[in-house]
A protein has these predicted regions:
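Short amphipathic alpha-helical segments and helix-helix/interface helices
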Residues: 1, 31-34, 146, 175, ...
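Short, acidic/polar
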Residues: 1-5, 78-88, 168-181, 239-246
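Substrate-binding cleft and catalytic face of glycoside hydrolase catalytic domains
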Residues: 2-158, 163-165, 232
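Conserved residues at the C-terminal ends of beta-strands
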Residues: 15, 102, 191, 256-259
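Short glycine-rich, flexible loops that bind phosphorylated cofactors or substrates
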Residues: 21, 197, 265
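Aromatic-rich peripheral "rim/lid" segments of glycoside hydrolase catalytic domains that contact
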Residues: 116-127, 205, 212-218, 231-290
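Glycoside hydrolase catalytic-domain groove-lining segments
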Residues: 151-158, 165-236, 245-248, 253
Length: 290
């Protein structure tokens, strides 16, 4: 964390899993990391996945302990989990500036085959199973998480986060659903993973999307995730420099987070970090210190 701060990063984004098998990213782990960041003077974002494992466009599975709950019980579980983690931070004197309620939730969240308790935004076919669409539940789950955040930290900004930040149609679809359901939130956050051969086009589309979200929904915006191939550091630096500059030009844009900067080389099969195989940061991260 100290190295990343010295490289120009002033904020950290920490994911929360409900009951991970190895303990990483559970409540105590998140509090420990947030405390370290707090001691370094960094701003903190908490990212609730509402899952025991990674939640992303291909995986929005319920925590094992929540399977079989009724709709009301599920909402209670969302609220209790959210408040439990945030109160643990509060007890340590840590105030997160932003809180995500769900991670890359374009296909919804807390999938279930039973439409009455599913939060999918469309019928999601996965491995011979179809997780049922229920837009109302999807919006209600976000509302539940948002209200829980505000109960503990009234001034924290609630984030709704989708993938494919360059896809304006997707964002209009999801945020029209939330608007129709009067869902409370503060910030629209995006992921963007450009290729080395199309980054100019993707950055331009993402910036246009941010501008449209500000205009259409009167919300602040943010890049919650951006990543580029670690072994193309100069191209990555050019992309990040342009994205950061254009984001700064949007008054309502709150910032840009890299994910996952300290992933080195192709560690664990992931190639979009910003450290090389020797464990040193590449020049890509110079973009954060300009």
């Amino acid at each position: 964390m100290t190295l990343l701060r010295d490289l120009g990063m002033n904020s950290i984004r920490l994911r929360v899993w409900v009951n991970p098998s190895d303990g990483w990213c559970n409540k105590s782990d998140v509090v420990a990391k947030a405390w370290r960041a707090h001691q370094l003077g960094m701003r903190v974002m908490i990212d609730f996945h509402y899952s025991d494992v990674w939640a992303d466009p291909g995986s929005q599975y319920k925590p094992a302990a929540w399977i079989g709950l009724s709709l009301d019980e599920l909402k209670t579980a969302i609220a209790d989990h959210t408040k439990d983690v945030l109160n643990a931070l509060k007890e340590k004197g840590i105030t997160p500036e932003w809180v995500q309620v769900g991670n890359e939730i374009t296909p919804g969240m807390l999938w279930d085959e039973d439409a009455t308790v599913s939060g999918a935004t469309y019928d999601v076919p996965k491995e011979g199973v179809t997780y049922a669409k229920n837009e109302k539940n999807f919006a209600d789950f976000i509302t539940t998480g948002s209200n829980a955040v505000k109960e503990v930290f009234p001034n924290a900004k609630v984030i709704v986060h989708l993938h494919d930040g360059n896809n304006n149609g997707t964002y209009r679809w999801i945020f029209d659903i939330l608007k129709a359901n009067n869902t409370p939130y503060d910030v629209i956050a995006m992921s963007l993973y450009p290729g080395t051969d199309n980054w100019q086009e993707m950055v331009a589309a993402c910036v246009a999307n941010m501008e449209d979200m500000v205009s259409r929904y009167n919300k602040e915006v943010m890049i919650a995730e951006v990543g580029m191939p670690w072994d193309e550091p100069e191209i990555s630096k050019s992309c990040l420099t342009e994205l950061i500059a254009k984001s700064k030009a949007i008054e309502q844009c709150l910032g840009v987070f890299y994910w996952e900067p300290q992933s080195y080389g192709s560690w664990n099969g992931y190639t979009l970090g910003a450290f090389d195989e020797s464990g040193k940061p590449t020049v890509a991260l110079d973009a954060f210190n300009q």
